[in-house]
Each structure stands twice: as C-alpha cells, then as structure tokens.
C-alpha cells in the first residue's frame, strides 16, 4: 500500500510540474508586457532630463525637456497598475474587460486603504503612519497612488490584483443574473465583483503588508550589508540566479522586487536624516552646511537655521551669496544645535520640492528605480560646501555602498552609529583660521547600506555586449570551414541581437538544450562574475530593460560625460576580460564534446531527402495495410518528440499541434519541420507548438491513439524502422484510379448573412491559407451538415468550435466564430462544453434533415467573441476541384447551395 501511495504521489507531482511551469511561463509573458515599455520610458526620462538639466536658463528648452521627461515619469510612477492590467489580460485570454476590471480593482482597493492610513501627527512634526494595529509605520511603506496615500505594494500589489482579476473574470464572465438585474450579467458583472472583492483584499493588505514592507527593507539591508562586507557577494549570487532562471522564463519575477521595491534599497529612510559626507581620500567625516549658489558660482547658499542658530532643520529659509570663510564662521558658532536633512538638501539643490516628487513617482525604492530617480533628480553634478571648508560634488558614488576598504571606503553618505559624534580636536585650518569642523570616522556607518544604484542590472553589460559575441565567434570558428557561413547566419545574428538590444535568448537557446551544462556551468557562472566585478569595482551604469548598447550609451557613457561617475569605462574592461574566457572555453568545449551547434554535428536533413523518405513510406504502405499514412506520420512525430513516454500533454487547435514534453532534449525539431510543420515554437522550455495547418488535429488524434494503445506501436515501429533501413525497396505498384464525382454541391450549414473572407478578422482565413470559401454571420445557433446525404464528420474538434466534413470526397471546414477555441481550451475529455453542444461524433455520417451537428449558444458567444463563421473548402480538395460560387452575398438559409465544385480532370 505504501508503494502504491508513493507511486500515486510521484505521478501527481510529475503531472503537475509541467502545468506549473507553463503557468509560470505565462506569468513571465504577462510581466514582459509592462517591462517592454520601460526602454522607451527610460529614453524619455534620460533625454528629457538631459535637456532640462542643461537648458542654461532657457525657459523654452527647459520646458521641452520636462515635457519629454514626464512621458517616462508616468510609466514608472504607475508600474503597479500596469502590471495589474497586464497580468489580468494575460490570464483571461487577452480579454479587454479583464484589463478594465483590474484598473477598477486597483483604484477602489487603494481608495479603501487610504481611508485607514492615519498620519502619526497631523501637524507633521513626527513622521510615520498608524495603520490598524501597526504603529509608526515608516514613510517608505506608503506611496501616492492615483493621488491617494496608500500602501506601497509596488509591483507585488499589481500582480496580486491582476491575478485575482483574472480569476474573477474567468469565473464570472458568462454569469447569468435574474432578469430584473439582467443588465449586469456577463462581462459587466466582472468589474462589479472586483470592486466588492477589493474591500477584503484592502483590509487583508492593511493587516499584513506593513510587515511585508518592513521585511523587504530588511532584505534590502541584508543584501547591502552582504555587498559591503562580502565583497559584492550579493551581486554574484544575484547574477547566477538571474541567468539560471532564463530557461524557465521566471527571471522577471525574480528581479522585479530588487529593481522596483525597497528590497533593492531605499532612499526614503534618510529623508529627515542629517547629511554627513566622507569625501574621497579623507580620513574624517564632515557635515554639509550649504550648496553652491545657482546665480553666483563660487558662492554658497547657507540654511538660515545653520547661520542664525534656530533649532532644528532649516525649514526653507536661506542666506545666499556667502563665501566659504564667512559661511564656516556662521556655522561654527551655531552648529551644535542644527542640521541639514537630505530632503532639504535635495529640495535646495533643485529649487523645488523634488524629494517629495521622486517619492510620489516611486523613484526612491529599488536599485533600478533609484538610479533613474537620481538621474532625473537634478542633484547629480551639483556642489555642496562641507564643514571642513572644501566643496564636494554629488555623484552616484555618494550613495553607492559597494566596494571593499582596500581601494575605497564605499558610499560617501554616512550616518552616526549612535548619539552625537565627537569632533576631531584639531580642526583643519582654512584661510589661516581653524574655523572648520571634522568628525571621527569610526563613529559613522553607511547611510543606506543596502543601496548601490543599478547593482542588480549593470552586470549584464559586459557579457551581453562583449562576452556573448566572443562566445558566438568561438562557436562559428568551431564549425568546419565549409559550414561557417551557415553557422554565422544563425549564431552571428543572435550575437548581434544580444549586443544591440540585450536580448540573449536567441543565442543562449542555440546550446541551452543541447548542452545545459555549458549554460549552467560556464555561461551562467561568467554572467555572475560580470555582475560581481561591476559591483566590486564600483560601477553604476543604469538600464531600463537589458544590457544593450543603446542603454550603455544613454545610461553609462552620457552620465559619465556629465561627471556623474557611473564608471562606464569598466564595461569594456570587464567585457574583454570575460571574452578572454568565453572564447577559448566555448571553442574548446564545442570541439571537445562535438556539440551539434549550428554548422556542426550530423548532416542536416534536406527537403529533397525528406520527400524521398516519404516516398519510401508510401511504398511500404502497399506492403503493410495495417497502418495508413497518417498513422505512419504520427508515429514519426511521436519519435521526434522523444517517444510516447516523453509526452506529458498533447493538444491541438485549428492549425497548431501543442505538445508538452518531459525532457526537451529528446525533441528533434528538424524532423518535426521536415514532416511539414511551418514552424516550431516554444512558449516554455517543455511546451512545443508546431504549425501544421488543419493537419494538426489529425496528427493529435493519431498520436493519441498510439499513446493510448489503440494502435499496435510495436508493429508500427517495425514499419518505421524499415523505412529508415537501407534495404532495397519493393516495386511501387500503380495507384488505382478511383471514380470521382464530377460535380459536388456544398450547402449552407446555417441561416445567416454571407460575407467575403476578406472581412474575417483572422489572417489564416482572410488570406486563404487553408483554402477558399465564404464567411457566414449566423442568425441562429442551429448548425447542420453541408450536404444532402452521406456527409461524414471527418474531424470534430474537442473544443466544439470547428469541424471538418467529407462531402463526397471534398473536405470542408466549418469554423464557428473567431478565437473560439479558447472557450473550452481548458476542458478535460468528458467535461461539458460551454457555448457549444456537439451532436455529432468523429467518423459519423449525417444528413441535412437529421438533428444538428452542433447547437451554439449564440448569445453567450457574442458576449466575448466575433461570431463570423468561415466556411472553407480545404486546399487539399481545391488541388483536384475548381470552386464555383453560387451565392456570395445577402441572406442565406440552411440547406441552400453555396458552392459548386467541378472536378478538374472532367472532359469538356
């Protein structure tokens, strides 16, 4: 009994592992929708800020820069709702109503939360908020959402809302309410239920999320401490995991918290903290006591609180036009009771409330968002006056806590460990007077230990720009000379894609499934080293999407050109170092293990060779009548997918064969394509989609019969093995000529209005890729067979939306509605279908006067789908018959003639 239970449990795990991976892959596809707009938003931010910050006082130029910048600002400020809408649409079969409902859900949820978030002190003399039983919740836990003070759930909240909305949509989109409130039935009910569910979700988040926010801050702090004390180990670990998750498509879900939330660091915690700086090369700490006068370079603006002795922070008042000596004199006499906060310094440097604006737009939390926030804040490159009389320029290094003590002391911004730090007795002499103030460095710690702007993204640049192209060159040169051109066309374009756009999958997938040890043991390790060295050597190169050359110029070279110390020069240095490892390693291992990378390995099967093999199969068919051609081809497909034991799930739609396998390394895509697939795609590493046109469902059924034991697999394999052998083929006997009906009339299967195929919103039908015919806009849901007598249901799709009929040897396809395959896509065999009530079975014969082949709930179908119905004579029949339309427009009744098919060999 115990053994049986273990087997059942293991079988359950294996069955659900594939579906979980598909779900995660779908989640990542959803995350990519908002992430895809970030590059352009980042360009708007970068270019807009560059124009605005260098406007030289020209109002029109500054306004234009701000105009461009705000286009990017709005995207980053609203990332959570973008994630919510994207996830909702992804998991609801691209339903626009689901996206709308997600927005309603998000807005109402945040409105409910805002009413229960109470400031600790309404007069703002104390910071923080009280939320239910949480007291003095820090500002970093709160964000401005749609103009409301709400919990800063960031992209996590967006994903939660999107997932719940998708669930509610899929559950209620077809709901029928009593007639008295029938207006709210169907999809109109979805936003209503979302608004209702937003209440308990808001309360649950208020009960839990403040603790989550605190935990995220602790994670960020822990990673920062690991980075500061562990020589960049946080980036090393991150780099490997991020690359290792690429095959599973879940890397977006992994890096999103570190890029976009306080887990990647937060500047909000130092808003009201004193500004202490340890300048490069100094062995002491100083206070910031002012900033350079905008109107008079070389002169300083001193906060009135520091100059006049008012207790507390400066509260906006300033004394302008001070030289450093007089500024220090004022400060020395009053310094002990006053300090300048980071919020005040940022606002003073930018002459506006820029700190609050950055917080409102969510640009003070997360490694990448902080980089963007600093980039557009207006404080980088600005000078401040220190309490030792020297000036200091604010750069990325002010906040970058990255490097070990043997070449730098990490971030320049510090905070006292506890209490008031003691001043060094002998102050530095300025202008002959000991009127400066310095402090003991041992009493300070890094202000934001968890922060190094862009530390979780910049590591991509060296290996994407230089490392991968070097590996690609090695793989090209490892191919035989006669096939290097072939290898270059595939590998070269993939490597160039990595360089220009930072999209690496085309290159990585050329060897990932062929040699996973090369991916995980070499490539992912070198990617981790790239992240580690960029962090360790104190780089701060930003990005919005990936490590592309475009991002390198915009967020590395340009900031360095402005003196902001992004240290982008490290990218080519580290990249060349990695290339010296990538090239010989990939070259040697490709040859040593004879990896069948593009241009290497076994001889590629040509189309000519495939046709010859197919002819041999037809020859064998004459000597073994136990198997038809479809079964033989299905057997070959089954082998191409690694055998029946490698099939985890098998399905098909109107044109695509969908196969989930257990081990993707066993799949031979070349054979699948040579068997007629127009293309083979992967949406997850184990999920293959092969485009076979209308043969997809036929192959699916035949393969399923083999897997279920309905076909003798042992005998079929003998036939397949014989086709692969070199024995002499028997003589091909002439194919007997069958009697063919000269003219065949196809009848309308339903009442409705005729439309040309050009009006069908599906390129497959509009462009007549599978055949020719007409479209019918049905007026009722009673569909009948398209002939008077002996109409065979050649194929009935399990989703109930499409059928292929055999009318006297002519294949005719009926496809009810557009994209309607989605309605019952998740139904298991035997489950009752929605919308479609199928009355016929595959292989059955029916007549026009018998009961309908399918009854359709047309009202329910129209709620979400276009009911226009393509009625197509398949291309395989058009090869032998000429189609002559009888009716092409206007109303049509069921049973009325639509086409006449004339046999092409008919003698006139």
Swiss-Prot record:
Organism: Mycoplasma genitalium (strain ATCC 33530 / DSM 19775 / NCTC 10195 / G37)
PROSITE patterns to which the protein is assigned, alphabetical: PTS_EIIA_TYPE_1, PTS_EIIA_TYPE_1_HIS, PTS_EIIB_TYPE_1, PTS_EIIC_TYPE_1
Subcellular location: Cell membrane
Residues of the signal peptide: none
Catalyzed reactions: N(pros)-phospho-L-histidyl-[protein] + D-glucose(out) = D-glucose 6-phosphate(in) + L-histidyl-[protein]
Keyword field contains Iron: no
Protein name, as recorded: PTS system glucose-specific EIICBA component
Enzyme class at the top of the EC tree: transferase
Gene it is expressed from: ptsG
GO biological processes: phosphoenolpyruvate-dependent sugar phosphotransferase system
Domain comment (free text): The EIIC domain forms the PTS system translocation channel and contains the specific substrate-binding site.
InterPro entries attached to this UniProt entry: Dup_hybrid_motif (IPR011055), Glu_permease_IIB (IPR036878), PTrfase_EIIB_Cys (IPR018113), PTS_EIIA_1_perm (IPR001127), PTS_EIIC (IPR003352), PTS_EIIC_1 (IPR013013), PTS_Glucose_EIICBA (IPR050429), PTS_IIB_1 (IPR001996)
Main location: membrane
Membrane topology, record value: Multi-pass membrane protein
Keywords of the record: Cell membrane, Kinase, Membrane, Phosphotransferase system, Sugar transport, Transferase, Transmembrane, Transmembrane helix, Transport
EC number: 2.7.1.199
GO CC annotations on file: plasma membrane
Stored Pfam families: PTS_EIIA_1, PTS_EIIB, PTS_EIIC
Segments passing through the bilayer: 31-51, 71-91, 100-120, 155-175, 189-209, 459-479, 487-507, 509-529, 536-556, 571-591
Residues in PTS EIIC type-1 domain copies: 1-264, 451-602
Domain PTS EIIA type-1: 762-875
Function statement: The phosphoenolpyruvate-dependent sugar phosphotransferase system (sugar PTS), a major carbohydrate active transport system, catalyzes the phosphorylation of incoming sugar substrates concomitantly with their translocation across the cell membrane. This system is involved in glucose transport.
């Amino acid at each position: 009994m115990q053994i049986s239970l273990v087997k059942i449990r293991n079988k359950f795990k294996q069955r659900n592992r594939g579906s979980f991976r598909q779900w995660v892959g779908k989640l990542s596809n959803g995350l990519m929708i908002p992430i895809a707009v970030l590059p352009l938003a980042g360009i708007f931010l970068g270019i807009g800020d560059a124009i605005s910050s260098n406007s030289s006082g020209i109002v029109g130029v500054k306004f234009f820069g701000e105009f461009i910048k705000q286009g990017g600002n709005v995207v980053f400020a609203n990332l959570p709702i973008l994630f919510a809408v994207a996830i909702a649409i992804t998991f609801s079969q691209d339903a626009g109503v689901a996206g709308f409902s997600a927005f309603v859900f998000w807005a109402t949820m945040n409105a409910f939360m805002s009413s229960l978030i109470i400031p600790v002190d309404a007069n703002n003399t104390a910071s923080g908020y009280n939320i239910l039983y949480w007291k003095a919740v820090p500002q970093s836990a709160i964000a401005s959402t749609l103009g409301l003070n709400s919990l800063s759930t960031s992209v996590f909240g967006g994903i939660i809302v999107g997932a719940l909305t998708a669930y509610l949509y899929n559950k209620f989109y077809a709901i029928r309410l009593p007639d008295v409130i029938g207006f709210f039935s169907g999809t109109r009910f979805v936003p209503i239920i979302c608004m209702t569910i937003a209440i308990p979700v808001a309360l649950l988040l208020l009960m839990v999320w403040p603790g989550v926010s605190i935990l995220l801050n602790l994670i960020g702090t822990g990673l920062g401490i690991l980075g500061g004390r562990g020589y960049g180990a946080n980036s090393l670990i991150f780099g490997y995991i991020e690359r290792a998750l690429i095959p599973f498509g879940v890397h977006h879900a992994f890096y999103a918290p570190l890029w976009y939330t306080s887990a990647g660091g937060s500047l909000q915690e130092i808003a009201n903290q004193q500004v202490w700086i340890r300048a490069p090369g100094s062995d002491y700490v100083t206070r910031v006591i002012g900033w350079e006068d905008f109107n008079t370079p070389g002169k300083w603006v001193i906060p009135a609180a520091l100059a006049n002795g008012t207790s507390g922070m400066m509260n906006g008042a300033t004394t302008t036009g001070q030289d450093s000596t007089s500024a220090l004199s004022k400060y020395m006499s009053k310094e002990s009771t006053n300090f300048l906060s980071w919020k005040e310094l940022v606002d003073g440097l930018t002459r506006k409330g820029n700190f609050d604006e950055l917080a409102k737009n969510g640009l003070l939390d997360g490694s990448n968002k902080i980089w963007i926030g600093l980039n557009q804040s207006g404080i980088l490159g600005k000078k401040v006056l220190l309490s030792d009389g020297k000036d200091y320029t604010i750069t990325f290094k002010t906040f970058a806590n990255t490097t070990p003590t043997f070449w730098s002391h990490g971030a320049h911004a510090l905070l006292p460990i506890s209490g008031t730090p003691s001043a060094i007795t002998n102050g530095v002499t300025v202008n002959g007077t000991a009127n400066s103030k310095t402090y003991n460095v041992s009493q300070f710690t890094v202000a934001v230990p968890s922060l190094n702007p862009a530390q979780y993204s910049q590591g991509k640049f060296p290996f994407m720009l230089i490392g991968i192209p070097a590996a690609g060159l090695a793989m090209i040169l490892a191919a035989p000379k006669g096939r290097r051109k072939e290898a270059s066309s595939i590998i070269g374009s993939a490597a160039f894609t990595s360089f220009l756009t930072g999209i690496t999958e085309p290159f990585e997938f050329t060897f990932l499934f062929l040699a996973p040890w090369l991916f995980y043991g070499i490539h992912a390790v070198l990617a981790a080293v790239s992240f580690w060295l960029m962090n360790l050597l104190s780089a701060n190169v930003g990005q919005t999407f990936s490590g592309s050359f475009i991002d390198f110029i915009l967020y590395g070279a340009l900031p360095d050109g402005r003196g902001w110390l992004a240290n982008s020069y490290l990218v080519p240095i580290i990249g060349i170092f990695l290339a010296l490892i990538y090239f010989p390693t990939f070259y040697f291992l490709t040859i040593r293990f004879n990896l069948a990378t593009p241009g290497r390995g076994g001889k590629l099967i040509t189309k000519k060779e495939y046709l010859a093999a197919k002819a041999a199969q037809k020859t064998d068919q004459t000597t073994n009548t136990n198997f038809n051609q479809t079964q033989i081809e299905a057997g070959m497909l089954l082998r191409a997918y690694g055998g029946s034991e490698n099939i985890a799930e098998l399905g098909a739609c109107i044109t695509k064969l969908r196969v989930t396998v257990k081990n993707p390394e066993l799949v031979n895509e070349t054979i699948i394509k040579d068997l007629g697939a127009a293309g083979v795609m992967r949406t997850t590493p184990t999920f293959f989609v092969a485009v076979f046109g209308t043969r997809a469902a036929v192959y699916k059924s035949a393969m399923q019969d083999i897997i279920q034991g309905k076909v003798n697999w042992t005998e079929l394999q003998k036939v397949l093995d014989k086709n692969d052998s070199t024995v002499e083929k028997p003589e091909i006997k002439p194919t007997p000529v069958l009697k063919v009906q000269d003219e065949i009339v196809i009848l309308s299967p339903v009442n409705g209005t005729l439309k040309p195929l050009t009006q069908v919103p599906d390129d497959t039908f509009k462009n007549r890729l599978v055949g020719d015919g007409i479209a019918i806009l049905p007026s009722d849901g009673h569909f009948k067979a398209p002939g008077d007598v002996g109409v065979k249901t050649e194929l009935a799709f399990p989703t109930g939306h499409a059928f292929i009929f055999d009318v006297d040897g002519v294949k005719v396809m009926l496809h009810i509605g557009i994209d309607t395959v989605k309605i019952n896509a998740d139904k298991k065999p035997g489950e009752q279908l929605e919308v479609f009530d199928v009355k016929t079975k595959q292989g059955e014969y029916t007549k026009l006067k018998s009961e309908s082949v399918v009854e359709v709930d047309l009202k329910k179908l129209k709620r979400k789908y276009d009911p226009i119905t393509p009625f197509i004579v398949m291309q395989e029949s058009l090869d032998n018959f000429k189609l002559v339309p009888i009716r092409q427009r206007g109303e049509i009744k069921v049973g009325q003639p639509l086409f006449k098919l004339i046999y092409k060999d008919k003698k006139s």
